[in-house]
């Protein structure tokens, strides 16, 4: 009988200890976005230059007088959502401009951990090599998401909002 009591006490202790384990955490609304994070039906990831569409290739349209743009894409298309830096006409090297620039990117209200994504160089048809943060959005199904960015390059401040609408292919 004492074996059954000891065994029952042991099982009860194990059950109580298991109940004390903290539940798995999910990203909070203010936590930084990292590669592989999902925001609703949108995957935030990195991409290869040749497999990604850049906002300057999309023909985004300005909405009114503010720096707000509407951008249209299709589900499954990989879209780099960051602003690019280029050296054409600046008299400086791209590396110099990149090291001096400041940039902040938010998806919805959440900041993006830019260092975790790294940068990517891409050939632009008019300005030559352009460097972007390698932040890529991919939609699993139709939807809309808002991106806000701001920064400073070569002493020039900028700020914009982009509303991306992903439609069925």
Task: Give the ranges of each region predicted by the language model.
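Contiguous segments within soluble domain cores/interaction surfaces
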Residues: 32, 46, 50-130
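Short, well-structured beta-strand segments within conserved domains
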Residues: 142-151
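Bacterial signal peptide processing site
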Residues: 21-23
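Beta-strand-rich interaction surfaces with strong enrichment in secreted/lumenal proteins
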Residues: 69, 134-138, 152
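Short, solvent-exposed, Trp/other aromatic-anchored flexible loops in extracytoplasmic proteins
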Residues: 124-143
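C-terminal motif of bacterial Sec signal peptides marking the signal peptidase cleavage site
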Residues: 16-19
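Bacterial N-terminal signal peptides that target proteins for export
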Residues: 1-9
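Extended, polar beta-sheet/loop recognition surfaces of beta-rich domains
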Residues: 154-169
């Amino acid at each position: 009988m004492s074996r059954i009591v000891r065994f029952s006490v042991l099982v009860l202790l194990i059950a109580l200890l298991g109940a004390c384990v903290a539940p798995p955490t999910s990203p909070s609304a203010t936590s930084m976005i990292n590669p592989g994070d999902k925001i609703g039906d949108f995957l935030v990831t990195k991409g290869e230059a040749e497999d990604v569409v850049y906002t300057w290739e999309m023909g985004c349209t300005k909405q009114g007088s503010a720096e707000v743009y509407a951008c249209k894409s299709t589900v499954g298309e990989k879209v780099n959502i960051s602003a690019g830096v280029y050296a054409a006409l600046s008299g400086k090297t791209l590396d110099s401009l990149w090291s001096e620039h400041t940039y902040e990117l938010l998806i919805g209200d959440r900041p993006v951990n830019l260092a975790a994504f790294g940068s990517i160089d891409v050939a632009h048809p008019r300005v030559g090599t352009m460097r972007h943060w390698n932040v890529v959005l991919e939609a699993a199904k139709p939807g809309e998401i808002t991106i806000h960015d701001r920064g400073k390059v070569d002493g020039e401040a900028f700020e914009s909002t982009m509303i991306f609408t992903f439609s069925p292919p």
